Structure formats: C-alpha cells, structure tokens
C-alpha cells in the first residue's frame, strides 16, 4: 500500500519540487545519472566534528554530495519521470521504522553543515528541509498536544505564560490544522487525479474504480502510519540527544511475517504513548476524544497493524486482485 501511494503521490510532489529547485535540486543514491569525473573531484564528503551519532562520518551522503557539486558550479537536477524501475520499500513495519530512524540520524547530522556560507543557498535549503522532515513529527505532536491541553483546560492565549501576546485569532488553530492536512494529502490527491485523467496510467492501476478504492484505503493506511512514525521518530530523537544512535546497516527487502511477539517487543512504547493520550483526554476532556482519533488510532493499533500488514495471505489476495497495483 505504501509503495502504491508513493507511485502516484511522489510523482506530483517531485514534479512540483523539481520546478522550483531547478538546477540546484537534491540527488538520491538510486536511479541517478552521474558525471563521474566531477563527482570524484568535487563530491567528497567532509568529516563532521565530534563523535557519533552527531559527528564523524556523514551517513546520509547523497544530499551532501549534491550540495558539494553545486558549490563547484555543476547542476543537480531531478527529472520527475518514470523509467521502469523504482526503489523497493521495506516489507514490514519494523524494517520500515528502522530505515526511517537510520535516515533520521543521518539527516540530523546536517545541523553541522546547513550554516556553511560557501554553499549554494538552495543546497542549504535542501539540507534544512531534510532536517525539518524529521523534526516535523515531534513538532506536530507538540502542536497537537498544546492545542488539546488548551482546549481541555479552557485556556485562552492570555492565560498561557508561553504566549505573552494574548489570545490568538479565533480561526488560527483551525487554519493551521487545515494547512497541515492539505500539505500532507495534497500530493497524493493530485497524483490520483492525474492518474484518473490519463487513460494509460489509469489502466496500469487496474482501472478507475480500482484506483479510487485503493487510493482511499491507502489514505486510511497513511493516517494510521503517520502518527506511528511521529512517535517512533520523536522517541529516537530523544535517544540521539543522549548520544545513542543506530548502526548503519542495509535494510531487509525480502518479505517476511511479523509475529505478535516481535510486534509487541518493537512497538509497546508507541502503543503505550497512544494509550496515555487517550486515557488522559478521557479523564480531562472527554468531549475532545473525537479530535484525537487521527493522532491516537495508529499508535493504539500499532501491534495488530504491524502483524496484519505482513500476512502472506493478505499480500497474495491483494496481488491476485491487482489491488493497489504498482
């Protein structure tokens, strides 16, 4: 399902970002055409100050290599086209989370590099966006929590010491929530619309009805997955702040089932966080419970979610029906 969502969602996202990034875009270490002479001469990685996990060798190398090439006067462009190949995603939730946390550790190393004045401004923006990609989950949780606490205790801006400027405009919270949802789902909705309007693409997905049905299911899947990842990444950032990181090893790409025991061992903390959120609001503000469903449903269901999404019979059934075709 995630790969299906990436197929149409990333096409529209990449098309838009490639337009404004122009010749100073990012580079990913797959499906790339590289000027080897320039890459060897100008793409060498710096060694970061300090010890791992924040210092030492650069882990997320490709973005830094792109910025180094831009500094030397070369272009790095993203071509938002499909050429018949793509990178496979991890086959189960534990491996998916492991890869994301590995990237999180690598991207947060960019805090040492983003301020370099001799690098292209667009390249520095790319590094800043890569950092924010992983800080955004924690920021989202803080934003939602503060909003719910404010509502639960009936506080306005003038009663909260952290806001000395008084009460915010009445519609600001709603506008922020709408903006957040729009930024999250707009690329996928645009990609679905593009595929529906293109007869060849529509047929490659199994037809319009199959595309729309799978698109709705994938959106629901994404709504469960997003808060799971936000909690997992927030916990991991806290771990990084204590100097503990992950070993950078290759990810598993072969499909495998996740047992109840493994799912429980890996995700009990995320489930507990979701339960704390639900119990807290049930006690303090039961009227707000409906609003925390998007945040708490994924963490509460993470263990059966990790188990169910790796069942061989489910994968065979979806593939046999060409559901969520990629």
Regions found by a protein language model. Give the residues of each.
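Basic/Trp-rich segment in TM-proximal cytosolic loops or flexible interdomain/linker regions
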Residues: 22, 89-289
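Cytosolic/matrix-facing juxtamembrane and C-terminal tails of multi-pass cellular membrane proteins
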Residues: 307-326
């Amino acid at each position: 399902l995630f790969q299906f969502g990436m197929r149409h969602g990333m096409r529209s996202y990449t098309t838009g970002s490639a337009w404004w990034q122009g010749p100073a875009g990012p580079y990913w270490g797959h499906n790339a055409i590289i000027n080897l002479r320039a890459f060897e001469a100008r793409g060498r990685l710096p060694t970061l100050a300090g010890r791992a996990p924040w210092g030492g060798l650069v882990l997320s190398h490709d973005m830094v290599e792109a910025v180094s090439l831009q500094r030397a006067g070369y272009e790095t462009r993203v071509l938002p086209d499909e050429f018949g190949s793509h990178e496979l995603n991890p086959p189960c939730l534990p491996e998916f989370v492991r890869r994301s946390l590995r990237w999180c550790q690598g991207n947060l190393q960019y805090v040492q590099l983003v301020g370099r004045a001799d690098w292209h401004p667009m390249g520095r923006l790319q590094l800043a966006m890569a950092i924010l990609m992983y800080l955004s989950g924690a920021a989202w949780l803080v934003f939602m929590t503060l909003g719910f606490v404010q509502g639960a205790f009936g506080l306005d801006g003038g009663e909260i010491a952290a806001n000395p400027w008084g009460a915010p405009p009445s519609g600001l919270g709603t506008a922020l929530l709408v903006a957040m949802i729009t930024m999250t789902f707009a690329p996928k909705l645009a990609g679905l619309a593009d595929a529906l309007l293109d007869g060849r693409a529509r047929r490659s997905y199994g037809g319009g009805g199959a595309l729309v049905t799978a698109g709705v299911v994938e959106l629901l899947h994404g709504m469960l997955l997003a808060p799971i990842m936000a909690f997992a990444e927030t916990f991991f950032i806290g771990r990084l702040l204590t100097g503990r990181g992950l070993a950078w090893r290759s990810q598993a790409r072969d499909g495998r089932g996740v047992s109840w025991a493994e799912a429980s061992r890996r995700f009990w903390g995320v489930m507990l966080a979701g339960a704390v959120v639900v119990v807290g609001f049930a006690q303090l503000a039961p009227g707000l419970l409906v609003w925390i469903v998007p945040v708490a449903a994924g963490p509460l269901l993470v263990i059966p979610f990790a188990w169910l999404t790796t069942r061989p019979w489910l994968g065979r059934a979806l593939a046999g029906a060409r559901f969520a075709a990629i």
